């Protein structure tokens, strides 16, 4: 049997795919940078070998699965190609692999990871399920009926997939290094919609999704009257959120989620709609929604002295806004402090005013230096440009996080898609 070698095994899609293949009895290994990335923990638990990048890793008899961030000139990929060893890009491999199952793609500008995690949690309570979540979590099951996976619109990678179902959470302008406009983003989703085989579950409250055309039924969810699945009587508390669901104006059931913010009601509604469509009993859905513990790097809380620390992946103005709102729902009487690390110069430049506006929803703002991704390293923009647009915003360094101690009993939200976690760890060490 072939050995699957993953080039970039710590990637948020690559790591869970490696886990799935391992769980199904395949021999898996991979290579990546040596710096710790949170996605490697699940690999280490399975004793999957992680090697430093080297052309020497490539051996005859392997199948190489290449991460999308790595060009054909990468030493490992180059060696495999020169020696006739099969090289398959991540999204192409995934597109072929899912054909064995009833597949559900979860896509959208925001909410993909949380909704994928929630759907996987709920549906596996009813039927054997394999899943691939963009927080680095994967699970394979040889007897799976369903394959639930996160599908990213970046560089139109999701067009490699022809899923049975697609959940579309929203359309928004992001990835300005690739997409030219909101219309360009919409066109990508429209193209994706035409590749779905059985049905689309889409948010009808979204400005753009109601314009989607498809060759399969499109079921809409949201709070608006025109939706097929409508959440009504939403009650938010410090314990979570309760809401009634009406299916085409007929009462279906009442649901409780231990989660905060309007976006989590919509994510749950998408899952309820898909499960209803697949005739999963509402009692199973209700029970599973109650017990969902969330996904990695999405509103992950910990107590530190009299402060609450929250780690969140929010890196777009829309995500920052809803994360701050969720914190206010759970902690209405506490000071909310945002510690934000912008991710990529192109995104920061594109959304400078929007970042300033969304961060202003916090009581106090600290800014970390801009994190350049693997796709870019420098820009003319500096963090000072964003600081100048936010009243009283302060800059924070990894080696001087002690200023956060001044916020007695506050909720500190560390947000970003780069390495914002090192700032949170540094602060925890200061407080130890």
From Swiss-Prot:
Q: Which gene encodes it?
A: murC
Say what the protein does: Cell wall formation.
What catalytic activity is recorded?
A: UDP-N-acetyl-alpha-D-muramate + L-alanine + ATP = UDP-N-acetyl-alpha-D-muramoyl-L-alanine + ADP + phosphate + H(+)
| Enzyme nomenclature, EC number | 6.3.2.8
Q: Which PANTHER family does the entry mention?
A: UDP-N-ACETYLMURAMATE--L-ALANINE LIGASE (PTHR43445:SF3), UDP-N-ACETYLMURAMATE--L-ALANINE LIGASE-RELATED (PTHR43445)
**A Gene Ontology BP annotation from the UniProt entry:** regulation of cell shape
Q: Name one GO molecular function term.
A: UDP-N-acetylmuramate-L-alanine ligase activity
Give the UniProt subcellular location, in the record's own words. Cytoplasm
Pathway(s) per entry: Cell wall biogenesis; peptidoglycan biosynthesis
In which domain of life is the source organism classified? Bacteria
Alphabetized HAMAP family for the sequence: MurC (MF_00046)
| Protein name per Swiss-Prot or TrEMBL | UDP-N-acetylmuramate--L-alanine ligase
Principal localization reads cytoplasm
| Keyword terms | ATP-binding, Cell cycle, Cell division, Cell shape, Cell wall biogenesis/degradation, Cytoplasm, Ligase, Nucleotide-binding, Peptidoglycan synthesis
Organism, as annotated:
Bacillus subtilis (strain 168)
Which InterPro entries does the annotation name? Mur-like_cat_sf, Mur_ligase_C, Mur_ligase_C_dom_sf, Mur_ligase_cen, Mur_ligase_N, MurCDEF_pg_biosynth, UDP-N-AcMur_Ala_ligase_MurC
Cellular component terms per the entry's GO annotation: cytoplasm
């Amino acid at each position: 049997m072939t050995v699957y070698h993953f080039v970039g095994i710590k990637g948020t899609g690559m790591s869970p795919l490696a886990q799935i293949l391992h769980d199904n009895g395949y021999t898996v290994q991979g290579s990546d940078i040596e710096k710790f990335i949170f996605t490697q923990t699940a690999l280490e638990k399975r004793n999957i070998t992680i090697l430093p990048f080297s052309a020497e890793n490539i051996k005859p008899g392997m199948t190489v699965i290449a991460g999308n961030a790595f060009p054909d000139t990468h030493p490992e990929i180059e060696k495999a190609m020169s020696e006739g060893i099969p090289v398959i890009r991540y999204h192409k491999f995934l597109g072929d692999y899912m054909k064995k199952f009833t597949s559900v793609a979860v896509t959208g500008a925001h909410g993909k990871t949380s909704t994928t995690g929630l759907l996987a949690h709920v549906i596996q309570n009813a039927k054997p399920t394999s899943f691939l979540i963009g927080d680095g979590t994967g699970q394979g099951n040889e007897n799976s009926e369903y394959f639930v996976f996160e599908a990213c619109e970046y560089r139109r990678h999701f067009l490699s997939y022809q899923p049975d179902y697609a959940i579309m959470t929203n359309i928004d302008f992001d990835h300005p290094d690739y997409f030219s406009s909101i219309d360009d983003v919409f066109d990508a989703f429209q193209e994706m919609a035409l590749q779905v085989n059985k049905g689309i579950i889409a948010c009808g409250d979204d400005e753009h999704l109601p314009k989607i055309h498809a060759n399969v039924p499109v079921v809409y969810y949201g709070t608006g009257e025109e939706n097929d699945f409508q959440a009504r009587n939403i009650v938010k508390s410090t314990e979570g959120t309760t809401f009634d669901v009406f299916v085409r104006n007929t009462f279906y059931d009442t649901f409780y989620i231990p989660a905060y913010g309007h976006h989590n009601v919509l994510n749950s509604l998408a899952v309820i709609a898909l499960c209803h469509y697949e005739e999963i009993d509402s009692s199973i859905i209700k029970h599973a929604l109650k017990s969902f513990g969330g996904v990695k790097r999405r509103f992950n809380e910990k107590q530190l002295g009299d402060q609450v620390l929250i780690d969140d992946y929010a890196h777009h103005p829309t995500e920052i806004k809803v994360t701050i709102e969720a914190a206010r729902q759970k902690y209405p009487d506490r000071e909310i402090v945002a510690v934000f690390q912008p991710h990529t110069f192109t995104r920061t430049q594109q959304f400078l005013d929007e970042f300033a506006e969304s961060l202003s929803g916090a009581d106090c703002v600290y800014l970390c230096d801009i994190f350049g991704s693997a796709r870019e390293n420098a820009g003319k923009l500096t963090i000072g440009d964003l600081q100048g647009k936010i009243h009283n915003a302060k800059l924070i360094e990894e080696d001087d996080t002690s200023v956060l101690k001044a916020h007695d009993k506050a909720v500190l939200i560390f947000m970003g898609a780069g390495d914002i976690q090192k700032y949170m760890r540094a602060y925890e060490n200061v407080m130890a």
